Amino acid sequence: MFTINLLLLITPALIAMAFLTLMERKILGYMQLRKGPNTVGPYGVLQPIADAMKLFTKEPLLPSVSTTTLYMAAPTLALTIALLLWTPLPMPYSLINFNLGLLFVLATSSLAVYSILWSGWASNSNYALIGALRAVAQTISYGVTLAIILLSTLLMSGSFNLHSLITTQEQSWLLLPSWPLTMMWFISTLAETNRAPFDLTEGESELISGFNIEYAAGSFALFFMAEYMNIIMMNALTTTIFTATPYNMLTTELYTMNFMTKTLLLTILFLWIRTAYPRFRYDQLMYLLWKKFLPLTLALCMWYISMPMLLSGIPPQT
């Protein structure tokens, strides 16, 4: 039964990831006054299938100087972690209901650093290694901000459980009392998933794209799949933490539709930002985190800790 549930979770997530690539191209096309993919199938609907066939039927290339085991393991690890992150998400039922669901998400997402580091180091290419080091520095740096923001939401909900977090929002979304945290969370998720304007680790428009420069065919596709899976997962997590709809207001089917609509809107915002903003410089990226976001999130976290203590001394106003 667990295997069937696992397949029922993974298969729709993979299908959504495939068509997210098509949606991205279409949105980028229309924003640049062109049509995007429109040849393969009606209105280009079969383009993701054509891309998958092209990538997975190519001969896998292995650089002669690479460390074979780590080189092949890195993309597999990236996709495995991306799929593993979906297990505690309430949609409205989670595959595994962890009491420490938020901690599991935070710890597992941090493991993605290893796949990037392995890919850069095992390629034995200077360009790939430089890209991997920058990616690791960026991911770890923004992981700090994400952890502090999660701690602040825990103080409001009183539990690490994602289902309890939804119950907390019966009266109002956490977005309303913590909108500065929500804005910083959203920008940090852009950096965590290596999306524009923070796509310094994997510049698709550059000759040297980043840590995956030596990858081709199926192994490259696995990195690509992991990136888009993480985008959808991060937006689903944002929906759960800040704009969740309580279970008792909707039926299961309506809850799922509501949840996916919010996730889709956030994902479209990801793509819109890619179209609208140029890439940041690396020093600007680090300055934004260490000089702006980190002090602000720490100050807000202290605020959420101290306010209940201050208010506890006020007598009841009856």
UniProtKB/Swiss-Prot annotation:
Its main location: mitochondrion. It is a multi-pass membrane protein. The chain crosses the membrane at residues 2-22, 70-90, 98-118, 140-160, 173-193, 217-237, 253-273, 294-314. GO terms for molecular function: NADH dehydrogenase (ubiquinone) activity. Keywords: Electron transport, Membrane, Mitochondrion, Mitochondrion inner membrane, NAD, Respiratory chain, Translocase, Transmembrane, Transmembrane helix, Transport, Ubiquinone. Pfam families: NADHdh (PF00146). It catalyses: a ubiquinone + NADH + 5 H(+)(in) = a ubiquinol + NAD(+) + 4 H(+)(out). One of its GO terms (cellular component) is mitochondrial inner membrane. It comes from the Eukaryota. PROSITE patterns: COMPLEX1_ND1_1, COMPLEX1_ND1_2. GO terms for biological process: aerobic respiration. It is an enzyme of class 7 (translocase). The keyword S-adenosyl-L-methionine does not apply. Its EC number is 7.1.1.2. Belongs to the complex I subunit 1 family. Core subunit of the mitochondrial membrane respiratory chain NADH dehydrogenase (Complex I) that is believed to belong to the minimal assembly required for catalysis. Complex I functions in the transfer of electrons from NADH to the respiratory chain. The immediate electron acceptor for the enzyme is believed to be ubiquinone. PANTHER family: NADH DEHYDROGENASE SUBUNIT 1, NADH-UBIQUINONE OXIDOREDUCTASE CHAIN 1. This is NADH-ubiquinone oxidoreductase chain 1. The lineage of its organism: Eukaryota, Metazoa, Chordata, Craniata, Vertebrata.
